[in-house]
Design a protein with these regions (language model features):
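Generic structural signal for well-ordered alpha-helices
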Residues: 16-18, 43, 47, 70-74, ...
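Metal-dependent polysaccharide deacetylase catalytic core of the NodB/CE4 family, i.e.
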Residues: 28-30, 51-178, 194-208
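C-terminal domain-boundary segment and adjacent tail
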Residues: 17-25, 53, 67-68, 210-243
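Short, acidic/polar
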Residues: 40-47, 183-187
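Well-ordered, non-membrane alpha-helical segments in soluble/globular domains
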Residues: 114, 180-184, 216-221
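A short, acidic, amphipathic alpha-helical segment used as a generic capping/interface helix at domain edges
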Residues: 179-194
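Active-site-adjacent substrate/metal-binding segments within catalytic domains
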Residues: 30-40
């Protein structure tokens, strides 16, 4: 399912759909990435926690987010974070039940990505600042990754296993709901069992109001402190991937 491929000078791990899902597994490094479509309730907490720990994150936003929250984008850029694309329209590229078929044409995909980079440029972000992107719903296939690559954009995604990406779930989801404590404990369990070397760890920049137990309130800070104590360094996206 997984192949090793050299990107730049770094050894990265790709999944079977050709997205980079882990950076160099021989290095005790973690990269924090954040996505948002239309919510920014985590802005103050996340910006201040990363500042406190001297960490540069990667932030991937939709076109709507850039239009709704220009001040948040400015703040992130002023702090030296990578601010990039999560697509323009948060399109669903494939049906959930069939990853091998497509709901978008290549032209629709390219138009959406061009719009995304256009709205980024208005915010002062050039292509060279953010040549990587996290696809909407973190859901893609080989064709999507190839189309992106053809535009000079490398598709990346979170390293599976820690369930950090479940921090968006809400109590009404029943069995799918994951509390912040559950997620924190799961991250530590994976660390203990196999380590988190090269992990791309995804956290949502904002979540639904129905979720009052926000991971960024308390647990994000605690997680960073614990992992630093265990000897991990937090490395920016482009440095970690060698792109």
């Amino acid at each position: 399912e997984i192949s090793l491929g050299l990107v730049g000078s770094e050894m990265c791990i790709r999944d079977r759909n050709d997205g980079i899902i882990r950076t160099d597994p021989s290095k005790k490094q973690i990269t924090l990435v954040f996505t948002a479509a239309d919510k920014a309730d985590g802005a103050d907490a996340i910006i201040s926690i990363l500042k406190k720990h001297g960490i540069k994150g990667g932030f991937f936003f939709t076109g709507e987010f850039y239009e709704l929250y220009p001040d948040v984008v400015k703040r992130l850029r002023a702090e030296g974070h990578l601010v990039g694309s999560h697509s323009y329209g948060h399109l669903l590229y494939m049906p959930w039940e069939n990853r091998d078929s497509l709901l978008v044409t290549r032209e629709q995909f390219e138009q959406d990505m061009l719009k995304s980079y256009e709205v980024m440029r208005k915010a002062g972000i050039e292509y060279k600042d953010a040549p990587v992107y996290i696809p909407p719903y973190e859901y893609y296939n080989k064709e999507i990754a190839a189309w992106a690559k053809n535009m000079g954009i490398q598709l990346i995604n979170y390293t599976p296993g820690t369930m950090s990406n479940a921090d968006y779930t809400t109590p009404d989801m029943g069995a799918k709901y994951r509390s912040s404590k559950f997620i924190y404990d799961k991250i530590m369990e994976v660390e203990k069992k196999e380590g988190l070397n090269g992990h791309l760890m995804l956290i949502h920049f904002g979540t639904d109001d129905r979720r009052t137990d926000k991971f960024y309130n308390g647990y994000l800070d605690k997680m960073i402190k614990t992992l630093k104590r265990k000897g991990y360094t937090f490395v920016p996206v482009l440095e970690a991937t060698g792109i």
